[in-house]
């Protein structure tokens, strides 16, 4: 953080140095709180299958942040005040986790064995460092090699895809502990069957969310940036690439949740670092001639590389099943993407919403059609899995009715 405060004002001098440093420090506070107060208790709640507590607090923080920021902007508050409010909203989560675990669950820290050692802790740390590099590559490369207008365009689209990623990624919450428990009990057959059904549900949910995003993101940005003329915010090719990259980045959670649940950090360390290296190298090389599209291509290739590697590792090493059972999902995903992109290219759905209300109506129609399309294709390609999932859901519903 100290390096960023010193170096960034030298790279970008569009604002006063004091303002730049102040904003960096304000934005860093929520991250510091998350890692120094919240991360340990977050992981504990996840391992204890109480991640719903984190989800509820997170939802509250998001809503509170939106209301607070909108109010301050409406009142004409400065960017510094708005960012302080944003930080305050998000430090609620780690502070709540800290007190919830320590008070409500009443952990006795005196019973902790002094000579206990966490295996692979440095490999886990190494993967996190690679993750931080990877998720910040796009912004850093664009900041260093392009102008502020380009970064602003990226930020708008990234705002949408990040929100979508969090919605879909929520379906992996708690799966680590479930898979880890099955693996520890050596219930390989149950683990393999459960994971297959989980793949089906996760890919179905992901495509039901991401296909509408592919169609709706440009109309949303057009409405969101109406009247703003500092940059060309309508970037359809970049939008498509960024959405597909985020889709691949999100779907890897299916396999990373399995890999990390069995503690295979060291075995997958190289894959994670290669992803970061591919992303950085391709983004830097391509940004000169392609700008936004260049960094999107770099991120997409890197995410696809890691997704395939994690697919292969989880299938061959952990589940000990045919790799094609996972790999065929890529063919299904690409088929669905191509169909939607062709629909967009030939303007088959020729409707342009003009405000948020008409956009919401349009989004509802697109969501319904996408849901029908995704379920039809996924069931057609995975009939046996679909049947197992249906029986599982039916059993759960029937059980709840009985009780």
Descriptions of predicted regions:
Residues 6-27, 216-246, 354-357:
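Interfacial segments at transmembrane-helix termini and the short loops linking adjacent helices
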Residues 20, 79-80, 116-120, 124, ...:
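Interfacial/gating helices of multi-pass transporter permease domains
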Residues 30, 85, 91, 122, ...:
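Alpha-helical transmembrane segments of polytopic membrane transporters and translocases
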Residues 33-56, 80, 101, 105, ...:
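Membrane-interface junctions at transmembrane-helix termini in multi-pass inner-membrane proteins
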Residues 46-47, 161-199, 255-261:
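Helix-loop junctions and terminal segments of transmembrane helices
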Residues 56-103, 118-120, 127, 158-161, ...:
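Hydrophobic alpha-helical transmembrane segments
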Residues 79-80, 95-136, 140, 174, ...:
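Interhelical loop/hinge segments that connect adjacent transmembrane helices in multipass membrane
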Residues 344-403:
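Membrane-proximal transmembrane or re-entrant/amphipathic helices at the cytosolic face
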């Amino acid at each position: 953080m100290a390096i960023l405060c010193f170096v960034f004002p030298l790279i970008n001098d569009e604002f006063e140095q004091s303002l730049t440093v102040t904003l960096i420090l304000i934005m860093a506070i929520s991250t510091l709180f998350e890692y120094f107060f919240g991360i340990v208790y977050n992981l504990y709640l996840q391992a204890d299958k109480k991640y719903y507590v984190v989800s509820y607090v997170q939802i509250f923080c998001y809503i509170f942040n939106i209301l607070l920021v909108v109010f301050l902007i409406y009142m004409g508050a400065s960017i510094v005040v708005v960012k302080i409010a944003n930080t305050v909203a998000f430090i609620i989560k780690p502070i709540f986790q800290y007190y919830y675990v320590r008070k409500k669950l009443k952990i006795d820290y005196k019973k902790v064995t002094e000579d206990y050692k966490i295996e692979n802790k440095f490999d886990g740390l190494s993967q996190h460092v690679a993750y931080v590099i990877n998720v910040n590559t796009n912004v850093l490369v664009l900041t260093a090699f392009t102008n502020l207008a380009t970064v602003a365009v990226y930020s708008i689209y990234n705002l949408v895809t990040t929100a979508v990623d969090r919605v879909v990624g929520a379906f992996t919450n708690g799966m680590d502990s479930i898979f880890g428990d099955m693996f520890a009990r050596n219930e390989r057959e149950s683990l393999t069957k459960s994971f297959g059904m989980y793949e089906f549900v996760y890919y179905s949910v992901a495509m039901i969310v991401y296909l509408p995003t592919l169609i709706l993101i440009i109309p949303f940005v057009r409405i969101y940036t109406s009247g703003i003329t500092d940059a060309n915010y309508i970037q359809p090719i970049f939008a498509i690439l960024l959405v597909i990259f985020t889709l691949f980045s999100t779907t890897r959670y299916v396999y990373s949740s399995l890999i990390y649940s069995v503690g295979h950090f060291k075995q997958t360390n190289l894959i994670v670092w290669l992803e970061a290296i591919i992303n950085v190298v391709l983004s830097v090389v391509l940004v000169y001639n392609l700008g936004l599209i260049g960094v999107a291509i770099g991120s997409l290739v890197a995410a696809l590389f890691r997704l395939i590697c994690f697919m292969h590792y989880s299938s061959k090493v952990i589940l000990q099943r045919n790799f094609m059972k996972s790999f065929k999902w890529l063919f299904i995903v690409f088929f669905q993407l191509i169909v939607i992109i062709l629909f967009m290219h030939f303007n088959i759905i020729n409707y342009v919403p003009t405000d948020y209300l008409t956009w919401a109506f349009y989004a509802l129609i697109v969501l319904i059609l996408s849901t029908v399309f995704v379920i039809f294709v996924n069931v057609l390609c995975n009939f046996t899995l679909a049947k197992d999932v249906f029986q599982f859901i039916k059993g759960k519903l029937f059980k709840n009715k009985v009780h």
